């Protein structure tokens, strides 16, 4: 079979297994570091005896979501971490697998793999928390619960746009579309760091963040110099068009259009990342921009 033409899940599994085995020590240190971050959150909120049980779980859920969001973005920029040296690039590029299989392997590692690692690391921190609880005297009842299960359950419920609360059932469709739109924007933001990780060498996270900040500043400066003092009646045609088509031109339509646009941007970033990956060389040019 020609490995340059056909996608094979068996080869993909072998590439992922090889990547995991060769980097087991780095993965272990990463896992322990993430566990320590979650353990610090547990210990911090164990000293807080005020507030209700719901507040206690909400605080943990907020901290878990913040840590997870940062880690997923950071490790997205580390997509090509296993190809930073000439020896690593030679070893990875010479694997008997297609470029797509190698790219998908790394993509799964920094997305699904990292999320699973975060879940397990937070679970380990929960186990350690329970192990140290006997050393604390007279702990309130709100601390004697499985915080890991309740906190992650709340996060998943909040991220699920189809589980609208009772006060949002009046316009549930708009709430669902708004949630999907927000998730699409988050995927687009994540894809920017996937793209940055495939383009930059070292310090991809900081370089990508710096470019995003620079572009935001330039856009803000450009917008500030635009004269928005339009004459009367400039947008009358737009107002009339919206009133004549209000049966379909509503917030649901706008949310759907925005979702589609960001999905296109996300797909383009992933496609461009793959194209950059296929152009990886064992010996990189000496003079390379950034």
Predicted regions and their residues:
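Hydrophobic alpha-helical transmembrane segments of membrane proteins
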Residues: 1-90, 99-290
